[in-house]
Amino acid sequence: MVKESDILVVGGGHAGIEASLIAAKMGARVHLITMLIDTIGLASCNPAIGGLGKGHLTKEVDVLGGAMGIITDNSGLQYRVLNASKGPAVRGTRAQIDMDTYRIFARNLVLNTPNLSVSQEMTESLILENDEVVGVTTNINNTYRAKKVIITTGTFLKGVVHIGEHQNQNGRFGENASNSLALNLRELGFKVDRLKTGTCPRVAGNSIDFEGLEEHFGDTNPPYFSYKTKDFNPTQLSCFITYTNPITHQIIRDNFHRAPLFSGQIEGIGPRYCPSIEDKINRFSEKERHQLFLEPQTIHKSEYYINGLSTSLPLDVQEKVIHSIKGLENALITRYGYAIEYDFIQPTELTHTLETKKIKGLYLAGQINGTTGYEEAAAQGLMAGINAVLALKNQAPFILKRNEAYIGVLIDDLVTKGTNEPYRMFTSRAEYRLLLREDNTLFRLGEHAYRLGLMEQDFYKELKKDQQAIQENLKRLKEYVLTPSKEVLKRLNELDENPINDKVDGISLLARDSFNAEKMRSFFSFLAPLNERVLEQIKIECKYNIYIEKQHENIAKMDSMLKVSIPKDFVFKGIPGLSLEAVEKLEKFRPKSLFEASEISGITPANLDVLHLYIHLRKNS
């Protein structure tokens, strides 16, 4: 049977959900093919969304019309702002989720979205015509034809689950791997490598001894992810903290020879920032203990996820390890930890739209591109879906810059640098992180969302009013001169503020940590009518004024530099500071400008600086 649609999405994980929902929302006829409809939106690993860098991604996905934020706000068990005591640029919203509620909410959203149909089957191969994808075939002999195909297969491509010496061809424990599609992608000439990730054991909640464990609460004023969420007052559950100990470590050391990670059984490279417990014991042998979080998987607290204990050790060793830990002496393991090894395609095979360079109309998103994490997958799925629709409409692609969004940083890192280990987002990856805060996501991306038809007009108008109020009042504060007069000193004293000794502007005064919203309204009467969102932005802009201005200057400098043309006869060979790889790629692609050079995978900002210098020297000579 042959079925037709505009866009096919393969895989119903976090990338596939966003890709299919956004494409349908933008008016395309979308069909989602997934192995099991019941597992759409399943959180395969930890029961949490957000965190440092990841919270930024989730909020960006939300502003651009995505679903992850609203699903999380409707399924969370605990909400916190991480790094709350630090600056706003490095704070991250994180939520523990009820895995069942999240999955069911996501599935129902997908099944009830207009323009979006779903079928339960396995995609086996792509159909190509003249190096352009036109459809797929499935394991039940269905043929689906479409103008665009988005592959979001997660860990299922030639997936192998490892628990001790035991191996099985699974994409997730108990679910079949996608071997035919994996072979098809290799045959098409994509650069395929292997990666490894893992998950932690789960234990029965009624078998844990919580007495004596440190209780970890959610925030009193819980933060939420979606700007559409109203009247947020969720029921919050506690997590609990326990630790490994020298006995735990000795059990693991005694069984290193049985660990797939060390025996040579696993070839794929694992995540640097989420190592297994056996890897931690091996690499950090001097540490006497490692922190573990016991996280409820559902509102019923029937199972707890042991965060920090990712492992692929044999079953009997996992039992001993868990029973050596305080609070878990009599714990009943409901699900064992395991490692999973899988195929991924080097993301340097992609353009910034996430379309493959090799095959027109084929987009890749999520772990197939070498990333790890639900949020990274969701961000890619969203961007692939948007760009597939824009291509259908013959409209310009939607590419976010590194100075606009963490999504821009994520995709630029992937397609220009590639990866040889699971890529995870951190705030440290962004050069302009002071400009890319969670709190200003709406202001950064609202205009894009509205232009794409993904934000309501009335809300956008209010947002623009707020944006205008921020700029006008910052200008007014900069021009507002304060001198240490009796009146000014008296007013500062009444607000329990230190006096000023010299002439200052309003921005300098608001840069003080102690100058909160209440004091802002009291001291500067023109700020009194402003809403909390506007006041928060004014406060942050004042506090980091010098650094924010510097970052804007750097962006302007970079934008100016990227406009520089490269002479047709420019010789790249022999320029000090350019690696052999950079020279080879520049000679091969012959970019016409530094911007085109920046789009070539492997060309770094340092390479661009060197090129800029030598182009300038050549002009002057």
UniProtKB/Swiss-Prot annotation:
Transmembrane segments: none annotated. FAD binds at G11, G12, G13, H14, A15, G16. SUPFAM superfamilies: FAD/NAD(P)-binding domain (SSF51905). It is found in: Cytoplasm. The keyword NAD applies. GO terms for cellular component: cytosol. NAD(+) binds at residues 270-284. Keywords: Cytoplasm, FAD, Flavoprotein, NAD, tRNA processing. InterPro entries: FAD/NAD-bd_sf, GIDA_C_N, MnmG, MnmG-rel, MnmG-rel_CS, MnmG_C, MnmG_C_subdom, MnmG_C_subdom_sf. Pfam families: GIDA, GIDA_C_1st, SAM_GIDA_C. Its cofactor is FAD. One of its GO terms (molecular function) is flavin adenine dinucleotide binding. GO terms for biological process: tRNA methylation; tRNA wobble uridine modification. Homodimer. Heterotetramer of two MnmE and two MnmG subunits. NCBIfam families: mnmG_gidA (TIGR00136). Belongs to the MnmG family. NAD-binding protein involved in the addition of a carboxymethylaminomethyl (cmnm) group at the wobble position (U34) of certain tRNAs, forming tRNA-cmnm(5)s(2)U34. This is tRNA uridine 5-carboxymethylaminomethyl modification enzyme MnmG. It comes from Helicobacter pylori (strain HPAG1).
